[in-house]
């Protein structure tokens, strides 16, 4: 089980300056030394490097684009197999109701339970309906990861209206809820923890220096 506390997302995509499994492992080490209780990471290679560097539970994902589907976070059994090989403690996958490129969400959950019974599963959702569906399927954790990042939730931010969407999710499911997406300040982190989430994932505000720099520069340009 993931501990209560701060999970730091250590990810850099291929077009980003810090794209490197070695660099991500050092980013994870910095997070560990700062008090993080877990890491969220993308790709088998990054996860293996991170697990060699820090003794923390890892939420693993594989981001891969597919034609004719907007689902890209651990979209098929191929990505699941890569994550099982990485020996991450938790596999996270897109649990939205969008059209998937291959297996159904139900089939992927069954696949993970069969092939990796000791691995926990996290649902990345965008709506309360999707949270309820994930709970019905037996996900161990339900994360607000994709709220604001789908075509039908675009422009919505987790912290709007004092985290009302997060409150709605917490009231709708019995599963452990993870706050993720636009938790961008220590005060926001404290607020979501006080609301009763199991843990919170923070990424860009900690591990994306290019984006952090842009925010400082943008203030003067505005």
Curated annotation (Swiss-Prot):
The keyword Cell inner membrane does not apply. Belongs to the NanE family. The lineage of its organism: Bacteria, Bacillati, Bacillota, Bacilli, Bacillales. Pathway: Amino-sugar metabolism; N-acetylneuraminate degradation; D-fructose 6-phosphate from N-acetylneuraminate: step 3/5. One of its GO terms (molecular function) is N-acylglucosamine-6-phosphate 2-epimerase activity. Converts N-acetylmannosamine-6-phosphate (ManNAc-6-P) to N-acetylglucosamine-6-phosphate (GlcNAc-6-P). One of its GO terms (cellular component) is cytosol. GO terms for biological process: carbohydrate metabolic process; N-acetylmannosamine catabolic process; N-acetylneuraminate catabolic process. SUPFAM superfamilies: Ribulose-phoshate binding barrel. Pfam families: NanE. Its EC number is 5.1.3.9. InterPro entries: Aldolase_TIM, NanE, RibuloseP-bd_barrel. Keywords: Carbohydrate metabolism, Isomerase. It catalyses: an N-acyl-D-glucosamine 6-phosphate = an N-acyl-D-mannosamine 6-phosphate. This is Putative N-acetylmannosamine-6-phosphate 2-epimerase.
């Amino acid at each position: 089980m993931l501990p209560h506390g701060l999970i730091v997302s250590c990810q850099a995509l291929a077009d980003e300056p810090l794209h490197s499994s070695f660099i991500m492992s050092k980013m994870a080490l910095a997070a560990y030394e700062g008090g993080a209780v877990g890491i969220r990471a993308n790709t088998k290679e990054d996860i293996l490097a991170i697990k060699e560097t820090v003794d923390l539970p890892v939420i693993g994902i594989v981001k891969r684009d597919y034609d004719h589907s907007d689902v890209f976070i651990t979209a098929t059994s191929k990505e699941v197999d890569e994550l099982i090989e990485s020996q991450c403690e938790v596999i996270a996958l897109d649990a939205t109701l969008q059209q998937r490129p291959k297996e159904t969400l139900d089939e992927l959950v069954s696949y993970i339970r069969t092939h990796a019974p000791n691995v926990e599963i996290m649902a990345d959702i965008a709506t309360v309906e999707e949270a309820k569906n994930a709970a019905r399927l037996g996900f161990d954790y339900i994360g607000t990861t994709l709220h604001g990042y789908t075509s039908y939730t675009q422009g919505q931010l987790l912290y709007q209206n004092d985290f009302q969407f997060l409150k709605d999710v917490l009231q709708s499911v019995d599963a452990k809820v993870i706050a993720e997406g636009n938790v961008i300040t220590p005060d926001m982190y404290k607020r979501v923890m006080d609301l009763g989430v199991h843990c919170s994932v923070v990424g860009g505000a900690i591990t994306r220096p290019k984006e952090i720099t842009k925010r400082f520069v943008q203030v003067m340009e505005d």
